Amino acid sequence: MFLQNAWYAVAWCDEVTDGIVTRKVLGRELALFRDGEGQPRAILNRCPHRFAPLSLGKRIGDAIQCPYHGLHFGPDGRCVHNPHGDGVVPDVATPTFPARERHKLIWAWMGDPALATDDIAGGEYGYLDDVELDLLPRGHLHLDCDYRLVIDNLMDPAHVAVLHDSALASEALIRAVPRVWREEDVIRVESWAPDSKPSFLFGAWLGNHDDPVDHWVASRWQAAGLLSVEGGVVAVGGDREDGLRVRGAHMITPETETSAHYFWAVVRNFREDDAEQSEQIRATTAAIFTGEDKWMLEAIERSMDGEEFWSLRPAILGTDRAAVMVRRALESEIKAEGRPKVVAVSAG
């Protein structure tokens, strides 16, 4: 089940330069490239003549030359040159998808182009714009699991205490009762642990593992797979804005029904210009996501063995409320998208 009319992250901006990048999104393989003005373009990676992957071809000016028979396709997907015979250009095109460059990422809109919005996630990822690209801890992870399992994971503060016990766990956060609420099309969950010891990573960043702090973790979801997760600590009784904070952007893009792309980046409000600190955060985050989250989510996918999530009748804990709300909201949006539109006709 995929939401078509939504923006999906498909590449980091510096991945798409002079060549052609391929990425499968919602079961369709895209060819990503930049036109002569440097704007990102996304077309179906399939020549409409004999179905050769266009990504195996060459860039010639604004066009891509098919590697099989040499037809040229422009940024709008239309054939613009036929090298054979009388040179008559066939009236054919490969499908195109709206593409944007925002917040250091390339995004593609997989649904109706007329419905593509100008903004992405309501500008939520604007905090990525304030960090130089070479100082931004970031990555792209491929997972062999349903994309909704990844979203469940990010909206579930309870798993941190067990799966990430060595780096992120906090005894007080384990006992905290998450607050869950909805603001229009955004669902949020937050856990608050006052007067408690920091997790290992926050203790390391503070340089103090023993003194109590007020600790929090908060997640935000917006369709289809756009999430932010913030963790922070502040002196007991202090203002959260004065605390030490780390904020993660998590963009989940379905590849197929059982695989996904996970784009992530982390910003912080301490030692922001320290390249060594950035690399330490990148390496630590990548190790956690790869060695713990990816490992677990792919194991869950295998364990489910192709069964539909709700058909397995999962036990629901109190800490699952946010993840369940998101699943229901996403299911509702997908169903609404598939319904025929009702057009009112006035009586004549």
From Swiss-Prot:
Catalysed reaction(s)? butachlor + 2 reduced [2Fe-2S]-[ferredoxin] + O2 + 2 H(+) = butyl formate + N-(2,6-diethylphenyl)-2-chloroacetamide + 2 oxidized [2Fe-2S]-[ferredoxin] + H2O; alachlor + 2 reduced [2Fe-2S]-[ferredoxin] + O2 + 2 H(+) = methyl formate + N-(2,6-diethylphenyl)-2-chloroacetamide + 2 oxidized [2Fe-2S]-[ferredoxin] + H2O; acetochlor + 2 reduced [2Fe-2S]-[ferredoxin] + O2 + 2 H(+) = N-(2-ethyl-6-methylphenyl)-2-chloroacetamide + ethyl formate + 2 oxidized [2Fe-2S]-[ferredoxin] + H2O
User: Which species is this record about?
Assistant: Rhizorhabdus wittichii (strain DC-6 / KACC 16600)
Enzyme class per UniProt:
oxidoreductase
Single biological process term from Gene Ontology: catabolic process
What this protein is called in its record is Chloroacetanilide N-alkylformylase, oxygenase component
Q: Which CDD domains match?
A: RHO_alpha_C_DMO-like
Activity control, as annotated, is: Activity enhanced by Fe(2+) and Mg(2+) ions. Divalent cations such as Ca(2+), Cr(2+), Co(2+), and Mn(2+) show moderate inhibition of the enzyme, whereas heavy metal ions such as Ag(+), Cu(2+), Pb(2+), Hg(2+), Ni(2+) and Zn(2+) severely inhibit the activity.
**Which gene is this protein's source?**
cndA
User: Which InterPro entries does the record cross-reference, listed alphabetically?
Assistant: Cholesterol_7-desaturase, Rieske_2Fe-2S, Rieske_2Fe-2S_sf, VanA_C_cat
- Cofactor note as given: Binds 1 [2Fe-2S] cluster per subunit.
